[in-house]
A protein has these predicted regions:
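Two-component/phosphorelay signaling modules centered on CheY-like receiver
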Residues: 4, 12-31
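Active-site beta3 strand of CheY-like receiver
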Residues: 46-53
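Receiver (REC) domain active-site loop signature in two-component systems and cognate sites
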Residues: 58-61
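Conserved nucleotide-binding and Mg2+-coordinating catalytic segments in signaling enzymes
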Residues: 126-147
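Active-site-proximal structural segments of metal-dependent nucleotidyl cyclase/transferase enzymes
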Residues: 143-159
Length: 159
């Protein structure tokens, strides 16, 4: 069975590696060092990410800017975002939710909590692209997969 793609976005290599270690047995994990790199990876449509774990305080492009950018491009409807940040203030949490985050928790974090939250969010969103009876793509999943294939074919240099 193909593993679900998860994108980790954090400027701290230690945090990225720790999250990768927690998730790698169940998920195909990809990493971005900053928000700009994450947006580029998502927009390239090279692969379909089913979930993003996002830090807020990063250089180049912070997590709030990532949420705002993806929201404007209508990319958050298919990509649930869990914010994992050192800033646990009500203002930061509320702002992340207003910009489209589906969950938010602060660092330091428990590996069990991370894994359970990721599983819960993915199971909630799974019905949007997967048929419950067959396990195959439903209409929305098929359309999204087709769009990605067409996008990749159009941008391919060797054809």
């Amino acid at each position: 069975m193909e593993k679900t793609n998860v994108l980790i976005v954090d400027d701290s290599s230690i945090n990225r590696e720790l999250l990768q270690y927690i998730l790698q047995d169940r998920y195909q994990v990809y990493q971005a060092e900053n928000g700009a790199q994450a947006v580029e990876m998502i927009q390239s449509r090279e692969r379909i990410y089913r979930l993003m774990l996002l830090d807020i305080q990063m250089p180049v492009m912070d997590g709030f800017d990532v949420l705002e950018c993806l929201g404007k491009k209508k990319l958050l409807k298919d990509l649930p975002v869990i914010v994992i940040s050192g800033d646990a203030s009500n203002t930061a949490v509320l702002h992340a939710y207003e910009l489209g985050a589906v969950d938010y928790f602060s660092k330091p974090f428990s590996p069990e909590i991370v894994l359970n939250r990721v599983q819960n969010i993915l199971s909630l969103y799974k019905h949007e692209y997967q048929d419950a009876l067959t396990g195959g793509y439903n209409r929305c999943g098929f359309i999204r997969k087709t769009e990605n294939i067409l996008h990749n074919a159009a941008s391919a240099k060797d054809y």
